[in-house]
């Protein structure tokens, strides 16, 4: 079928910032789609608010807009660009909802824009719970007993008719947002109230709970000629009742009979055909574990998180094929670019097993609600491939980059039963513990509902582990059969080291001595029936190896692993650009990573991809097989940097900044000595190894002090403590201080934080830009709003900052990228807070707003070039004409029990960028892009700590002057009233928020982070009711500026990336 010749320009809407439920998978799918459209000769216009994405690079689309993903802004872009078509299904739920809104409100008709691929009616039928149920009824497919409601009274009546427990599912939401399982009327009222607010059409489905049934997913694709194939079927190990994004998922399914498999496959094809979806589609089923009864749970009429997993699991490029189908091509006309020979109409075949395990943020939020249900809580996921389930399962656990719990603890049977009956993020580890304690698989099936197949396989891991522990001496003396069996089962060197009581590297030496080495197999979509042109490998312990090794110069790039707080998509952006930079210099680029959501693990990003855990063992195995000595770690976040020492000790050459310099930045004593010797101020600080030493040195420094563990990312475990009692609590509860795990203690210096990213070749230094944080020191840089260019530095201060940066680069022998964080105190004195000898999360932002390809130039330096050979630019690059504001984005609504108060520990999951000709407009855009519902009037509630009340006087006055009605809690109101301000006291702030009377909350915490305190309750209730809540007066001042100084016309202005005038570089 020929492509529609009327379509010459296509608009693609991205998914926006990384949030729980919508992560990097849409950068991957959007990038693939844009490339597919350009291959067909179409002009592509892309709009996305997330600057940390590959898809917002200027070479991905012909025109790129970093603008808020709202109806008004997209309408303005359509008006300006006049696209012929809109691709609605590759930007996640955000992109889909916007496309529907644009169609329903007549914008697409007005400007002559055609929805490509799946049409409006099909989207509405899949997303509207009522229409979808009617369709299933028409085609004879079973659906769960349920009813659509749009009010609380009807919800209660429906639940009582169906019988508790019930599941609540809001329409047009992502990640199960606003949904949940209700056991009683009280829980139902709470969930439905939030669900109705989250739904775009104020509609929720109340359905009978099938908790405990098997959950299966089918990824299906259909073209406009009604050709349809299934790409992959996936089985959730966790039964129905846990969101699939929080479930451990296996592909292909392991426990279905042939009859069950084909029953659900035919149902999937029947449903996608009835809906008329053109492109990829995900269909979820509940299957009775005792028979052939099944129900359709839901359909995603778009590329989804599961699509990304299915793509990486099979090698089938779902997003690329979906984009071509949207243009009118048939499956039998689209080449499979993995094999280069077959066509997209061939169903993939798998001769291996894939396991996905979610990555949760509870290492950051230990007090958050860790229970799992229908609302997703994971920030990211890992994927592993093996020849059997246990191998892929254990490799996935190894990929999580978490400290594995110690087993063989003395837990009684009742405690274990309680820990596994209800699903928590760590349930699988307690299942392992139960097997260590002798619990039978049959009992665990009764407790968990997990299919016995998986339980027996997990028991096999424990049985072998116990055997290895009891035969330790024999193994160390050369009895290697058990060792070889353990490697085939999937046990890593580190797991074996713990069982044998020896270091990892000794396990490695032992197995290499006896020739126990991995082989590598290829993922090719066709189980080796055809040769693949895009090498994509995984390790296993078998005889035949499928890797073809070249004699080219090659470099290994270590990726950043799963998306998590503190290490997000920004590092994948850097890894992808590192690969491209190597390829530009004719160096073979080989990447190791384990995140199925990302562009770095796409089939055609690198010369070779190894889908492996990011540990010393697996990285060295790849390096040894490929004959690689050079490795780049600067772009994989802290995960990669932590490998510098073991890889160097194993003989690998870490390109760029050396191991000595990396260690120097983390050793606080040496770090301070080096900077002090060059008269560069640092806050007084020490590395301490015991509680006694910490108390003594904190007293010497003087409170408040900033405390944190060494070698962490995202400020994990970082706090400001004000006295000795708080310090003792921190050292006993938050971290475990030992000689092996010291704690850093610095004096806390109040002031403004300034952030510098620089490129150095060891002699010359280039500073693309300086960013200034809005919130004062004490809020993690990832959680701060940040302005480029810095606006409050004098010429003299800027010169001093540049001078310090150059000195630091030279002192630490920086080759490549460096990130330095300064604080400017009230007396105008700079202090160096932190030096990161690696890429930071601001690299993508500065690269885009300055036009300087920071990663590319850094890689060239690592390969031996100097800055002089690369560019004529030196020192600080002059800023362009525009102002950009980075605004962090949080997922607090998904994480119950987590305090939203900002502090030195990072909490945001993503960020957006607002760019404009003036600061207020840039702030306004950034806040809109971050999905803040900014009130232009109404009631604003203040509840402030005593220390902040005087400072807040000016802000409160301005809110009143602008016509807002200011309310306050009792003590705060009394303070303002005494000073003559028109502030109304409220005794029931929580009730007012719940009723929807309050439009904004300003709450600065006192000493309390405890859930019982009123401040904590205020913050949580505001978040759960989608009301803007700010915990910093600095932020509130900026918000107020944006609200009162930006005119209606300014609010609608859009600027493509190509029109950014950048420091002498026009991109």
Curated annotation (Swiss-Prot):
| Gene Ontology MF terms | ATP binding; carbamoyl-phosphate synthase (ammonia) activity; carbamoyl-phosphate synthase (glutamine-hydrolyzing) activity; metal ion binding
**Residues bound to Mn(2+) 2:** 298, 300
Residues annotated as binding ATP 1: 129, 169, 175-176, 208, 210, 215, 241-243, 284, 298
Q: Which cofactor does it need?
A: Mg(2+); Mn(2+)
Question: Residue ranges of the ATP-grasp domain?
Answer: 133-327, 672-863
Residues of the region (Allosteric domain) are 932-1067
Residues the entry annotates as binding Mg(2+) 1: 284, 298
Catalysis performed (reactions): hydrogencarbonate + L-glutamine + 2 ATP + H2O = carbamoyl phosphate + L-glutamate + 2 ADP + phosphate + 2 H(+)
Q: Name one Pfam family in it.
A: CPSase_L_D2
Q: Which UniProt keywords apply?
A: Amino-acid biosynthesis, Arginine biosynthesis, ATP-binding, Ligase, Magnesium, Manganese, Metal-binding, Nucleotide-binding, Pyrimidine biosynthesis, Repeat
Q: What is known of its domains?
A: The large subunit is composed of 2 ATP-grasp domains that are involved in binding the 2 ATP molecules needed for carbamoyl phosphate synthesis. The N-terminal ATP-grasp domain (referred to as the carboxyphosphate synthetic component) catalyzes the ATP-dependent phosphorylation of hydrogencarbonate to carboxyphosphate and the subsequent nucleophilic attack by ammonia to form a carbamate intermediate.
Stored PANTHER family: CARBAMOYL-PHOSPHATE SYNTHASE [AMMONIA], MITOCHONDRIAL (PTHR11405:SF53), CARBAMOYLTRANSFERASE FAMILY MEMBER (PTHR11405)
Entry similarity comment: Belongs to the CarB family.
Recorded protein name is: Carbamoyl phosphate synthase large chain
Q: What organism is this sequence from?
A: Halothermothrix orenii (strain H 168 / OCM 544 / DSM 9562)
Taxonomy, top ranks, is: Bacteria, Bacillati, Bacillota, Clostridia, Halanaerobiales
């Amino acid at each position: 079928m020929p492509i529609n010749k009327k379509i010459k320009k296509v608009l693609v809407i991205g998914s926006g910032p990384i949030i729980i439920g919508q992560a990097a998978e849409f950068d991957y799918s959007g990038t693939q789609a844009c490339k597919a459209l350009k291959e067909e000769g179409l002009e592509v216009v892309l709009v996305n608010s997330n600057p940390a994405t590959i898809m917002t690079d200027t070479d991905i689309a012909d025109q790129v807009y970093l603008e808020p993903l709202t109806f008004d802004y997209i309408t303005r872009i359509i008006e300006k660009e006049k696209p012929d078509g809109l691709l609605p299904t590759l930007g996640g739920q955000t992109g889909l909802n916007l496309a529907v809104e644009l169609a329903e409100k007549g914008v697409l008709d007005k400007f002559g824009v055609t929805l490509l691929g799946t049409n409006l009616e099909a989207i509405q039928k899949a997303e509207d719970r009522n229409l979808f149920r009617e369709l299933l009824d028409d085609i004879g497919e079973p659906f769960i007993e349920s009813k659509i409601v749009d009010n609380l009274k009807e919800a209660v009546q429906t639940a009582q008719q169906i019988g508790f427990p019930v599941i609540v599912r809001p329409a047009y939401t992502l990640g199960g947002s606003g949904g949940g399982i209700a056991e009683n009327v009280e829980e139902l009222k709470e969930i439905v109230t939030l669900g109705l607010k989250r739904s775009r059409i104020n509609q929720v489905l109340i359905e009978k709970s099938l908790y405990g049934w098997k959950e299966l997913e089918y990824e299906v694709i259909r073209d406009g000629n009604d050709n349809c194939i299934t790409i992959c079927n996936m089985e959730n190990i966790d039964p129905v009742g846990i969101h699939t994004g929080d479930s451990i998922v296996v592909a292909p399914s392991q426990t279905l009979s042939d009859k069950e498999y084909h029953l659900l496959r035919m149902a999937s094809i029947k449903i996608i055909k009835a809906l008329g979806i053109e492109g990829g589609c995900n269909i979820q089923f509940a299957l009775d574990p005792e028979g052939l009864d099944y129900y359709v749970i839901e359909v995603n009429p778009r590329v989804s998180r599961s699509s990304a997993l299915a793509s990486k699991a099979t090698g089938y490029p779902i997003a690329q094929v979906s984009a071509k189908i949207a243009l009118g091509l048939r499956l039998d006309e689209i080449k499979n670019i993995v094999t280069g020979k077959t066509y997209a109409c061939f169903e993939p075949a798998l001769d291996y097993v894939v396991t996905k395990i979610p990555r949760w943020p509870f290492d950051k939020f230990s007090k958050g609600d860790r229970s799992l249900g229908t609302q997703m809580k994971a920030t990211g996921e890992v994927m592993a491939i093996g020849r059997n389930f246990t191998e892929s399962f254990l490799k996935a656990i190894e990929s999580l980059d978490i400290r594995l719990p110690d087993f063989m603890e003395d837990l009684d049977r009742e405690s274990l039963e309680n820990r596994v009956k209800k699903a928590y993020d760590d349930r699988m580890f307690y299942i392992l513990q139960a097997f260590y304690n002798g619990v039978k698989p049959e009992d665990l099936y009764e407790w968990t509902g997990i299919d016995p197949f998986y339980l027996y396989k997990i028991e096999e891991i424990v049985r072998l582990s116990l055997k290895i522990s009891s035969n330790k001496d024999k193994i160390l003396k050369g009895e290697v059969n058990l060792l070889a069996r353990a490697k085939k089962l999937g046990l890593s060197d580190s797991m074996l080291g713990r069982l044998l009581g020896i270091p990892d590297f000794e396990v490695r030496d032992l197995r290499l001595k006896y020739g126990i080495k991995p082989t590598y197999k290829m993922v090719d979509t066709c189980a080796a029936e055809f040769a693949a042109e895009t090498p994509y490998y995984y390790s296993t312990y078998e005889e035949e190896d499928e890797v073809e090794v070249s004699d080219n110069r090659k470099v290994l790039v270590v990726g950043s692993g799963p998306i998590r707080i503190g290490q997000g998509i920004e590092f994948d952006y850097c890894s992808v650009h590192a690969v491209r930079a190597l390829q530009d210099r004719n160096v073979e680029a080989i990447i190791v990573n384990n995140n199925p959501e990302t562009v770095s693990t796409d089939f055609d990003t690198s010369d070779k991809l190894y889908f492996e855990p990011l540990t010393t063992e697996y990285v060295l195995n790849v390096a040894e097989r490929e004959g690689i000595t050079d490795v780049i770690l600067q772009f994989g976040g802290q995960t990669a940097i932590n490998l510098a020492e073991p890889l160097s000790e194993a003989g690998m050459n870490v390109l760029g900044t050396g191991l000595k310099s990396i260690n120097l930045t983390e050793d606080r004593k040496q770090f301070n000595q080096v900077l002090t010797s060059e008269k560069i101020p640092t806050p007084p600080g020490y590395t301490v190894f015991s509680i006694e030493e910490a108390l003594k040195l904190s007293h010497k420094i003087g409170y408040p002090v900033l405390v944190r563990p060494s070698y962490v990312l995202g400020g994990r475990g970082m706090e400001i403590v004000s006295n000795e009692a708080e310090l003792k609590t921190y050292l006993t509860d938050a971290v475990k201080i030992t000689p092996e795990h010291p704690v850093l203690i610095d004096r806390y210096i109040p002031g403004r934080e300034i952030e510098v990213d620089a490129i150095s070749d060891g002699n010359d230094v280039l500073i693309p830009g300086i960013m200034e944080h809005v919130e004062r020191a004490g809020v993690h840089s990832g959680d701060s709003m940040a302005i480029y260019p810095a606006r409050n530095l004098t010429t003299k201060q800027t010169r001093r900052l540049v001078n310090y940066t150059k000195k630091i680069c030279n002192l630490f022998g920086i080759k490549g990228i460096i990130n330095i964080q300064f604080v400017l105190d009230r007396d105008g004195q700079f202090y160096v807070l932190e030096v990161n000898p690696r890429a930071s999360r601001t690299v993508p932002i500065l690269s885009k707003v300055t036009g300087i390809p920071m990663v590319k130039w850094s890689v060239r330096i690592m390969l031996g070039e100097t800055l002089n050979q690369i560019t004529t630019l030196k020192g600080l690059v002059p800023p362009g004409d525009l102002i950009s504001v980075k605004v962090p984005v949080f997922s607090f609504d998904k994480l119950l029990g987590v305090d939203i108060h900002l502090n030195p520990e990072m909490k945001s999951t993503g960020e957006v960028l607002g760019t404009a000709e003036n600061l207020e407009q840039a702030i306004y855009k950034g806040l809109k892009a971050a999905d803040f519902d900014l009130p232009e009037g109404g009631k604003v509630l203040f509840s402030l700590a005593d220390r902040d009340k005087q400072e807040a006087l000016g802000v409160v006055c301005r809110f009143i002057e602008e016509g807002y009605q200011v309310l306050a809690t009792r003590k705060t109101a009394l303070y303002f009233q005494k000073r003559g301000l028109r502030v109304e006291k409220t005794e029931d702030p929580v009730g007012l928020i719940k009723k929807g009377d309050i439009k904004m909350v300003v709450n600065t915490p006192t000493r309390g982070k405890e859930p019982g305190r009123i401040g904590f309750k205020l913050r949580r209730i505001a978040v759960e009711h989608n009301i803007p809540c700010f915990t910093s007066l600095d932020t509130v001042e900026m918000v107020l500026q944006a609200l009162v100084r930006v005119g209606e016309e300014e609010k609608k202005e859009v600027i493509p990336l190509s029109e950014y005038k950048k420091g002498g570089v026009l991109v």
